[in-house]
Every structure is written in structure tokens, then in C-alpha cells.
Amino acid sequence: IAAGGPPPPGLDDEEKRAFEHVSFFYKHGLGYAQEMGNRPQTLYALEDSPIGLAAWIVDHDIWTYKQIARVFDGAEEGLTKDDIVDNITLYWLTKTGVSSSRLYWENKNAFFAPKGVNIPVVVSAFPEEICPIPRKWAERAYPKLIYYQKHPEGAHFAAWEQPQAIVDDLRDGFRSLR
């Protein structure tokens, strides 16, 4: 995908759509992840300026921008302006704008290649996620997948936009382990 190659043979329609979505993200929306993965110290400015932090959060990739922009366009579903300000405030007051990028630095060589996950896994799939995960992909990536739920709406901020769906999936998914 990162090299811009064609989809592998044998993908079903859902997998083709997911592949196209991920390919688009790799070509047009991965800049912020590359910055955090390769040069995280350049982001220390986020600790110095609440406006800089807000700009980074609001406009650091295409899908984030889409999710946030619809708030300011008057969309009634999803996030609110207060949600956005609350999130920026949480990052600012806890000084986690930079430390949150450590995930990218520490996983820069294997971010999209989960290996060795030998614990029970629950997957909540949302249609507008940056990297959609068809059930077949989840099953291949996580041999101990115990629950998979595909939702009709939600995106990269699903836990923020659809918190009850996440709670329900976690409860339903891990109930069998009690």
C-alpha cells in the first residue's frame, strides 16, 4: 500500500473498498503519522502554544479535518464545538500533546502489522475509520478474535462520537471471558 501498488488479487468488494480507503490515506493523509514517527521532537512546540496544539489537532489529517469541519458547518450528528474545545483543553492541561505521539515513534516500523497478539481481541469496525478493517482482515491479524461488530456510522473518533457503541462492544465482546 505504501508504495502505491495495486490491490492484491482475490479481495472481495468490502476488502477492495477498504484497500482503496487505506491507499488514499497512505498517499494523502499520513503526513502527521510520519512526523510523529520519524521526528517527534519537532512537535514540542505543541507544549508551548495552545493555538499551535489546536491547529495540530484540528487539521493534522484529512479525516480528522472532515470530522471536525462538519461541526463548524452546522452538522447535527457527531462531535460538537464544545467537544472539540474540551478535547484540546484536555491535551493542553495534561500536557499530553507530545507524549501522545510516542505511540507512532515506538511503532513506526510495525504500526499496521500486528504480530504476536495472543490475547482475546474485540474489534469495533466503523465505516469512516482511517484504516477500515473488514472482518476477514481482523481474523487474519488477530487469531484470538472473539468479537467483531461492524457499525453503521462512526469514524476515527468513534469512542468520542459513539461512546455507547464502544462500551456495548467491549461488554458484549468480553462477556464470554467472565
Model region roles, listed by residue range:
Residues 34-178:
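C-terminal subdomain of alpha/beta-hydrolase-fold enzymes, centered on the catalytic histidine
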